[in-house]
């Protein structure tokens, strides 16, 4: 009887130590949040339906002025192209990431990044992209594109990036 309990406890302990497998998606593996891993296939830049084409030719980001979340003329033009591509490629979902520069508090920049992401989301929905295909989140100043304390870096960090995923969120 003791041996049975010992084997059961040993089995449960071993199972608790195992790591879950990777989630396989259409474009490689994804984590528990549906984000593509570093080895995910993004397709060829020459394939107009690929993530690589979207990033290179369509453009995956728009920029903002200091302390602003309203879209300027250049941002709207870039988002018009994104909206058209997303409409023509309905199998993709987008995570819209809002970012801010390092100026200001963490809390303020998280809120500003969220407002920026929401303004992009609302614009894409107004252009015909289904709200069900769009998810917003904010990183505030936590994930800078460039690190330095100059306006050149700040302007690169005040952005929204559209990250594509194939499948469900």
Q: Which residues make up each language-model segment?
A:
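N-terminal targeting leaders that direct proteins to extracytoplasmic destinations
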Residues: 1-57, 70, 77, 167-169
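Surface-exposed loop/turn and secondary-structure junction residues enriched for glycine/proline
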Residues: 4, 61, 65-67, 74, ...
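Intrinsically disordered, low-complexity acidic/polar segments
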Residues: 22-23, 73, 105, 145
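N-terminal start-of-chain detector that recognizes signal peptides
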Residues: 33-37, 43, 65-68, 82, ...
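Extracytoplasmic/periplasmic, Sec-exported soluble proteins
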Residues: 46, 67-75, 88, 104, ...
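Alpha-helical scaffolding within the catalytic cores
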Residues: 48-49, 81, 149
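Periplasmic peptidoglycan-binding/anchoring modules of Gram-negative envelope and division proteins
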Residues: 52, 57, 63-97, 121-126, ...
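Periplasmic OmpA-like peptidoglycan-binding domain that tethers envelope proteins to the cell wall
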Residues: 99-168
């Amino acid at each position: 009887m003791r041996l049975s309990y010992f084997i059961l406890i040993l089995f449960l302990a071993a199972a608790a130590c195992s790591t879950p497998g990777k989630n396989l998606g259409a474009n490689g593996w994804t984590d528990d949040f549906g984000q593509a891993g570093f080895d995910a296939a993004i397709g060829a830049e020459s394939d107009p339906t690929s993530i690589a084409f979207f990033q290179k030719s369509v453009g995956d980001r728009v920029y903002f002025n200091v302390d602003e979340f309203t879209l300027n003329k250049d941002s709207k033009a870039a988002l018009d192209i994104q909206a058209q591509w997303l409409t023509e490629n309905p199998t993709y979902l987008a995570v819209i990431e809002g970012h801010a520069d390092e100026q200001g508090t963490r809390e303020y920049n998280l809120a500003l990044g969220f407002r920026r992401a929401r303004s992009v989301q609302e614009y894409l929905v107004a252009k015909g992209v289904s709200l069900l295909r769009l998810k917003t989140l904010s990183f505030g100043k936590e994930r800078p594109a460039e690190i330095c304390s100059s306006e050149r870096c700040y302007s690169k960090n005040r952005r929204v990036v559209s990250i594509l995923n194939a499948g469900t969120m």
